[in-house]
């Protein structure tokens, strides 16, 4: 009886060790941002939400976001049981499929609530980004910055189809600094177009905002 109990205890301990080892071997793949706040300098283009509260006519407060990116090689190296952090949550990997234009995890987000769809960047097929509902690219908040306006600011608002091709929309508009804030507010009131990080990029040159571009899917 004692020998049996000793054998049973050893078997249980072995199972526990195997379980712990399996848990330790499971790894988490996290995205990296395409933007480094500390390295922005005087000339840069970033994804940002334009804050229009207040009456400041000389500049804008920007909430800056970095696009969440993944290495294709890192994604393909994932195994069942591993985890990937995408769209604000961890997903346990069950299967990975290479599809046209990218990689689907667990069937992709269109087929499965627990799925993740990663798309290759147009200019870099070895780098992937994650898309959320309505094809918004998943991004991470990096910090806030105040930037003054240049003497003239180009505002571009375009509607895009599901593949990112322009459908037309509003012509480019060149505004004076005092006209920018009212224009952004009016765009929301008239057309419900928000200048948020999901669809907005802001260009700064020589330390001043020169262009704000919105690409939205109607």
Model-derived regions: residue spans:
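Sec-dependent N-terminal signal peptides of Gram-positive bacterial secreted proteins and lipoproteins
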Residues: 2-23
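Solvent-exposed hydroxyl-ligand-binding patches built from regularly spaced Ser/Thr
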Residues: 25-218
């Amino acid at each position: 009886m004692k020998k049996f109990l000793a054998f049973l205890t050893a078997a249980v301990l072995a199972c526990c060790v195997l379980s712990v080892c399996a848990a330790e071997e499971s790894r988490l793949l996290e995205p990296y941002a395409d933007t480094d706040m500390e390295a922005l300098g005087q000339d840069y283009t970033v994804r940002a939400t334009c804050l229009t509260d207040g009456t400041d006519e000389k500049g804008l407060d920007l909430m800056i976001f970095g696009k969440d990116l993944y290495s294709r090689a890192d994604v393909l190296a994932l195994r069942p049981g591993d985890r990937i952090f995408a769209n604000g949550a961890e997903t346990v990997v069950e299967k990975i499929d290479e599809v046209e234009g990218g990689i689907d995890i667990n069937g992709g987000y269109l087929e499965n609530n627990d799925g993740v769809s990663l798309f290759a960047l147009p200019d870099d097929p070895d780098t992937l980004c994650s898309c959320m509902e309505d094809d918004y690219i998943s991004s991470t908040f990096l910090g806030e910055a105040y930037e003054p306006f240049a003497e003239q600011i180009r505002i571009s608002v375009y509607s895009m189809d599901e593949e990112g091709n322009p459908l037309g929309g509003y012509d480019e508009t060149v505004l004076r600094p005092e006209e920018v804030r009212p224009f952004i507010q009016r765009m929301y009131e008239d057309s419900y177009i928000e200048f948020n990080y999901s669809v907005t990029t802001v260009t700064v040159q020589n330390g001043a905002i020169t262009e704000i571009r919105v690409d939205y899917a109607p």
